[in-house]
UniProtKB/Swiss-Prot annotation:
<dbReference type="GO" id="GO:0005816">
    <property type="term" value="C:spindle pole body"/>
</dbReference>
<dbReference type="Pfam" id="PF15272">
    <property type="entry name" value="BBP1_C"/>
</dbReference>
<comment type="similarity">
    <text>Belongs to the BBP1 family.</text>
</comment>
<feature type="compositionally biased region" description="Low complexity">
    <location>
        <begin position="87"/>
        <end position="96"/>
    </location>
</feature>
<feature type="coiled-coil region">
    <location>
        <begin position="223"/>
        <end position="331"/>
    </location>
</feature>
<comment type="function">
    <text>Component of the spindle pole body (SPB) required for insertion of the nascent SPB into the nuclear envelope and for the proper execution of spindle pole body (SPB) duplication. Connects the central plaque of the SPB with the half-bridge. Required for proper localization of CDC5 at the SPB and for proper M-phase progression.</text>
</comment>
<keyword id="KW-0206">Cytoskeleton</keyword>
<feature type="compositionally biased region" description="Basic and acidic residues">
    <location>
        <begin position="50"/>
        <end position="62"/>
    </location>
</feature>
<feature type="region of interest" description="Disordered">
    <location>
        <begin position="50"/>
        <end position="71"/>
    </location>
</feature>
<dbReference type="InterPro" id="IPR029328">
    <property type="entry name" value="Bbp1_N"/>
</dbReference>
<dbReference type="Pfam" id="PF15271">
    <property type="entry name" value="BBP1_N"/>
</dbReference>
<protein>
    <recommendedName>
        <fullName>Spindle pole component BBP1</fullName>
    </recommendedName>
</protein>
<comment type="subunit">
    <text>Homodimer.</text>
</comment>
<dbReference type="GO" id="GO:0005737">
    <property type="term" value="C:cytoplasm"/>
</dbReference>
<dbReference type="InterPro" id="IPR029330">
    <property type="entry name" value="Bbp1_C"/>
</dbReference>
<keyword id="KW-0963">Cytoplasm</keyword>
<feature type="region of interest" description="Disordered">
    <location>
        <begin position="87"/>
        <end position="123"/>
    </location>
</feature>
Amino acid sequence: MSSEQVDENTSGGIHGLYRWTMDALFGSRVSPSRKYREFAQDDTNYKSRDELFKGSYKDGNSRGRSNSWSGLDPNFYRRHDLLPLEESQSSSKSSLMDPVDLHPRAPASPVLDTTDTFGAKKGSWRRSESTIEFKSPSADDPVVSRLFEKRKPRHKENVITQRLAPQIPGKFPSPVKGPSSDYTSEYLEILNQLDRNGRALQEVNRGLWERCEQRQRQEKSYRDSYRETRAELINELKQSRKLYDNYYKLYGKYQQLKAISKETLDLQSKVNNLESELVDTAIKKEKQIHDLHKQLFQAELRAQEAESRRQRDAIAYESRIADLQRQLENRYRPSSPVSYRDQSTLSDYNASVDTQFLKNLV
């Protein structure tokens, strides 16, 4: 057997070149049938897996014989590198909940083979690191839960019947198949609901766009109003500043006028006092003037009386003189003219009368 492997894998010639070319183009894939033949011969046939099972026997674990129920265990296929049966895979209850392989032709985990010469050029056959892997919907997804809401109790009953099924040695039952159900109406209902939801989302989206446009218009109007209000506020602030400046100027003038008015009040009081004093003085002067006028009037009256008396005396004196002259003329009529020098020699001449007359004239 070992010589055959050497001949197939490492020997030269056309067969080795063909094998190397096939491995380089399509990858070295070992057929699972050969491994299955190795494990299916006998329980004691270990061959190249001696070291693998020695540790398990050291730990006290015994290897069980495969039976008809081993095909239902997924670990059986994983342990022996076997492909699962399509029937069992399609009959599993949770197959629709499992992840969907977007690259069914590519291996689940790419194996880096040193003999794969053209492995870098087969990127379309293998999964790349940038490929978005599909994630299965969760159990609480509304669509999945609605689709399988009628299937859950049946699934539980089937699980209970599977758990309670007796394991009879040597029996080869057929894989359990659930009753086929037609979910076309439910799919159509879900699709209609999705269509309605899509239209509702379009309406919501349209409403959101309208609200967004309305909000933009409102923001624009608010912005314009804000700018107008800001300009008005700036003008009002400028006017207020001018008003306050003028107010402070007027207040300063008011303070000055108040001080001046205070001084004016003091001066007015002084003027009033002076006016009162002046009035009193004027009254006194008027009284004095009145007294002086009265005295002057009395003096004038006395002067007039004296003048009238003097005039009367003068008239009396003149009449007296005239009488005396007539008397003298009548008494003495000389043959020759008589001078006044000779009158002093008259015996009846009174000099005191003339003296008194002269004083009255002065």
